[in-house]
Amino acid sequence: RIDAAGLLVIPGIIDSHMHASSWLAGRKSYKMLALAGVTTALEMAGPLEDVKEGLREDGSGITVGCLEMIRPGWNVQSASPKAEELSEVIFNALDRGAFGVKLLGGHYPLTPEASAQLIRLCDNNGVYLGIHAGSTEQGSNINGVKEIVDCAEGHAFHLAHMNAYCRGNILDVPQEVAFVEKILQSHPEIDSESYLSPINGCSGKCIDGVPESGITRNCLHSHGYEETQQGLREAIEDGFARVHLQKTDSVVLAEPNEGLRLWLEQNTNASMSFAVNPSLSNFYFATQKRPNGTFLSDSFCTDGGGIPRNVILENGLSLVKFGAITLKEFVFKSSTSAANLLGLANKGRLVVGADADITVVDYAKQKAVHAFS
């Protein structure tokens, strides 16, 4: 028996985009998410077998689906795979239990032509596709968003973390936000989410003196650092790049000296975060609505898990207290709409016959007290 007097009891929070594999975020993700009130989550990269193993050994009881990444040099030979190769990878992933597949365009891109082929294959076959915009031609920015929507030619897909494309890298942030809003308003077939944290998450791995991830290079460039291993080292020393430190039950951002030591000990293959997300774009995509009253971006996510930014509840309730959204709207966007986005008919609502996913919240402290899944 749980005494919930004075607490909020809401449908279990659904994180429509997180990371939990050892490749990016680590297996402490599952406990970190549960402690943040999350009861259901979509892991958006894989590798699938690593996620399965992590759930078996370190799962916290939350429900998890996984999108298998499409990554050149890993499960496709190059950045321009043909339809036959893509089909083989897609259906192999589904046969092994994947919820769908993910294009990591901002980190490990395909050509625009291959990206378009992937979108057509998935939509025509009813396969769930998540996309981080970006290609071999355009980066993870507003130009990448326009390009991937053009590539889709009206086909549906899930476009990840709308706030993360509006960091002022092409235009001023307000102009970028308006640019992306116009695209979303014109393409209701595209589902999307956004997150509420100032930090991102990426890899510090370097190959031949250059950061492997396009996102890492973008972050360095945006703040005047060289897009090299030396530039990344300087960013770590300055505290701009914060290496992830594994503690007993969580992941935290290391202080500069310790972060540099971890990065070097791991031969640069360490995950890290940069404080690159403007509050304007975070706020806008969390609250903005379409003319018909529905939210412009469908759901909240963390893009976290093992990346220490699991703040749907903490920062989402700040929006409620600020008056930007109502408590009912917070519940809708953090659970009901996310369930609809993922096709989870038995989640996102507290009704007889639905899954008994419940988050119990201390509203004053903006913290989860219990999470049942």
Place the predicted regions along the sequence by residue.
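Short, Lys/Arg- and Gly-enriched loop/turn segments at beta-strand edges
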Residues: 365-371
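His/Asp/Glu-enriched, well-ordered alpha-helical/loop segment
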Residues: 280-361
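Divalent metal-coordination and catalytic microenvironments
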Residues: 6, 17, 37, 64, ...
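Divalent-metal coordination cores built from histidine and acidic residues
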Residues: 26-108, 120-127
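Histidine/acidic residue-rich metal-binding segments in metalloenzymes
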Residues: 83-100, 109-267, 276-296
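Short active-site segment of divalent metal-dependent hydrolases/proteases
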Residues: 20-21, 135, 306
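Hydrophobic faces of well-ordered beta-strands that scaffold small-molecule active sites
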Residues: 12-18, 41-43, 64-69, 101-103, ...
